[in-house]
């Protein structure tokens, strides 16, 4: 069977849920027995989002092979339950840098390097490579931004050319748009969608399906009008209604026959998607009776997308505990020794997630100290693990001024120090310890119990600094347990205080491996401890 290509574009406004629509379709096709992969095209000129501010971009999602990618890849992995790779996120910066390197090496044999064919060919190669490396039946490609953005033009041209390259039966174009509702007039307006499709057709792409984002049901009359003016079949105008829970969306799209229309267009002979397990999960999510309160102490809390995988992992772990996780967003910049008890007193559990830079670190240390001294279940992640070690050094070991060499290079007690292989690296982007690495677990520890007594667990990392082994014996003598280390015992991966109900911190990012129907084990152990603490 020929590989099938589905391209998802957006119009009218950005942030209308293209990624969720693409991920939901991926889940439906996977549940039909098809092998699916998915990728995101981002038209910005950065090589990747690794050096972008979380306020600009939200979370950086790390793949198994160490690519720093768009947060939509997190949605893709959680919905479809697949592990993506570096070919799953492509930016303008990445494409141009590769083309320019080829030009410098003389690979274009003296030709004038142009957007067409060189940039568009490079984009098409990324699409085909993503399919080849995963041996997929179907590849879904989402293009970030909206039709009409000047940055998107080479991407859309590459998508247009794909139809001629692989055949019309192997390509489908899905266009997602906003259908605004004017409350004063009491009606929905189709004109923005019509203009968006007109713009897309002007670039040579005729959409085969429209997905309209609406607050209210559109009605068949609106769908017929859009079908007539946008030249798509009425049944191929699909609603994406606002929902209470994201995981309802695949079921809503299936109910409208979206996946069947896609299969018919692409001539895919696949059985109906069995969504029984997914439906049961959604039903459970919609009927959670109890709540558990988790305080998330972070520096980017004004933009919650900066912690989207953390939030989803907490929710997933709540599902298996039959509780709804209510998150109390605590700005680490506001936390002091004087107000920490007031800010965290009603927390059943406290999580201190990752981050970079000095700002907010002292507030996080106060939150960690509160959790340790008051025996509140606590999970530290990445920087949260490093600050857990610093807090213990200061307030238990009495090492006044203990800090990280990253945050205070002149500290007398560099509890956290730069990794040896990072010392001479000058570039910031793409140079961290990135991707999947193993952690060897200590028998009898809370970490080992969380992971069902596995000897080794593999999780994704994103860091440059590590625990300084010169202090390891001193910590252990005071009851601090290093419950996870690299197989060569050189790098500390997990720490804990066994006397507390749950006081565990890890250098890696467990949230990146969590799925709604298969929550990450360390998060689950943390939420379970928080539930027990609330009773």
From Swiss-Prot:
ATP binds at residues 15-20, 72. Belongs to the CTP synthase family. GO terms for biological process: 'de novo' CTP biosynthetic process; CTP biosynthetic process; pyrimidine nucleobase biosynthetic process. Residues 1-268 are annotated as: Amidoligase domain. Homotetramer. Residues 293-535 form the Glutamine amidotransferase type-1 domain. This is CTP synthase. The lineage of its organism: Bacteria, Bacillati, Bacillota, Bacilli, Lactobacillales. Its EC number is 6.3.4.2. Mg(2+) binds at residues 72, 142. CTPSs have evolved a hybrid strategy for distinguishing between UTP and CTP. The overlapping regions of the product feedback inhibitory and substrate sites recognize a common feature in both compounds, the triphosphate moiety. To differentiate isosteric substrate and product pyrimidine rings, an additional pocket far from the expected kinase/ligase catalytic site, specifically recognizes the cytosine and ribose portions of the product inhibitor. It comes from Streptococcus pneumoniae (strain ATCC BAA-255 / R6). It catalyses: UTP + L-glutamine + ATP + H2O = CTP + L-glutamate + ADP + phosphate + 2 H(+); L-glutamine + H2O = L-glutamate + NH4(+); UTP + NH4(+) + ATP = CTP + ADP + phosphate + 2 H(+). GO terms for molecular function: ATP binding; CTP synthase activity; glutaminase activity; identical protein binding; metal ion binding. Pathway: Pyrimidine metabolism; CTP biosynthesis via de novo pathway; CTP from UDP: step 2/2.
């Amino acid at each position: 069977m020929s590989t099938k290509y589905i391209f998802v574009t957006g119009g009218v406004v950005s942030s209308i849920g293209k990624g969720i629509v693409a991920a939901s379709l991926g889940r439906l096709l996977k549940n039909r027995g098809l092998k699916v992969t998915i990728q995101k095209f981002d038209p910005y000129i950065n090589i990747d989002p690794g050096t972008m501010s979380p306020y600009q971009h939200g979370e950086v999602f790390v793949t198994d092979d160490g690519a720093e990618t768009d947060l939509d890849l997190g949605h893709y992995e959680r919905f479809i339950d697949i592990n993506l790779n570096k070919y799953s996120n492509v930016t303008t910066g990445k494409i141009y840098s590769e083309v320019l390197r080829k030009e410098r090496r003389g690979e274009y044999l003296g030709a004038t390097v142009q957007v067409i064919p060189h940039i568009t060919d490079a984009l098409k190669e990324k699409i085909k490579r993503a399919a080849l490396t995963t041996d997929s039946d179907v590849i879904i490609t989402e293009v970030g931004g909206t039709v009409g953005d000047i940055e998107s033009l080479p991407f859309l041209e590459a998508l247009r050319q794909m139809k001629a390259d692989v055949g019309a039966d192997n390509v489908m174009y899905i266009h997602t748009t906003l259908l605004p509702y004017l409350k004063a007039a009491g009606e929905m307006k189709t004109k923005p969608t019509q203009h968006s499709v007109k713009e897309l057709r002007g670039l040579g792409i005729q959409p085969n399906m429209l997905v309209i984002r609406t607050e209210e049901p559109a009605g068949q009359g609106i769908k017929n009008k859009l079908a007539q003016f946008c030249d798509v079949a009425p049944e191929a105008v699909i609603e994406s209604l606002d929902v209470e829970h994201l995981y309802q969306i695949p079921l809503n799209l299936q109910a409208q026959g979206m996946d069947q229309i896609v299969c018919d267009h692409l001539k895919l002979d696949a059985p109906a998607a069995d969504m029984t397990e997914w439906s049961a999960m959604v039903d459970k999510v919609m009927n959670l009776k109890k709540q558990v309160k988790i305080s998330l102490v972070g520096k980017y809390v004004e933009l919650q997308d900066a912690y989207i995988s953390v939030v989803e992992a907490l929710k997933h772990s709540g599902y298996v505990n039959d509780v709804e996780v209510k998150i109390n967003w605590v700005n680490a910049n506001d936390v002091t020794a004087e107000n920490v008890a007031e800010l965290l007193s009603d927390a059943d559990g406290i999580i201190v997630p990752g981050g970079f830079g000095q700002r907010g670190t002292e507030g996080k240390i106060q939150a960690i100290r509160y959790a340790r001294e008051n025996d509140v279940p606590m999970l530290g992640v990445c920087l949260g693990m490093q600050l857990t070690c610093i807090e213990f050094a200061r307030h238990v070991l009495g090492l006044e001024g203990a800090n990280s060499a990253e945050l205070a290079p002149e500290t007398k007690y560099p509890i956290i120090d730069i990794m040896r292989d990072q010392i001479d690296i000058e570039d910031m982007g793409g140079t961290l310890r990135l991707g999947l690495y193993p952690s060897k677990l200590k028998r009898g520890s809370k970490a080992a119990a969380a992971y069902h007594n596995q000897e080794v667990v593999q999780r994704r990392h994103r860091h440059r600094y590590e625990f300084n082994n010169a202090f390891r014996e001193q910590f252990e003598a005071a009851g601090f347990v290093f419950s996870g280390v690299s197989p060569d015992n050189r790098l500390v991966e997990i720490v804990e205080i066994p006397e507390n109900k749950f006081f565990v911190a890890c250098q890696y990012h467990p949230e990146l491996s969590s799925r709604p129907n298969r929550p990450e084990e360390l998060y689950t152990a943390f939420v379970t401890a928080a539930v027990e603490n609330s009773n």
